[in-house]
Amino acid sequence: MRFTLNGAAVDVAVHPMARLLDVLRLDLGLTGTKEGCGEGECGACTVLIDGEPVCSCLVPVAQVEGTAVLSIEGLGDNHPLQHLFMNEVGAQCGICTPGMILAALSVGPTPTLDDIKTALAGNLCRCTGYSAIYRAVMKWREVEHAEGERSSQVSE
């Protein structure tokens, strides 16, 4: 199977029905994507496939051939949303955090609280509740929006 993973082309020789989650964790050694329920109910295994959040425990690797997959490792260690999750105490045990962060990337540039709740509806957290997570995503988008306005003013 060939696909792009975190910006790099990968070619893995695995059974086409192997779960993408297992290929990431076991075959490629990317353990940031977590298995929670294994049934697509909790969102811990969320990755982005062509920019859309998907539970990787439900996806046979054959379905990602020719696509672009982003796992939490693809963000690196310095993504602003990761820092805001820590600052707002939106992460505790860490099982849901990678999936929450990747699902949050699908939130539009000026979201309402309802937009954020909708984007994260497929992700469960047993530790923090959701207020800190929603706050982190809202602050991230506010900062991104403000920086975008500043850079457009500079270029005018």
What is each PLM-predicted segment?
Residues 1-156:
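Signature of N-terminal electron-transfer/Fe-S-associated modules in redox systems
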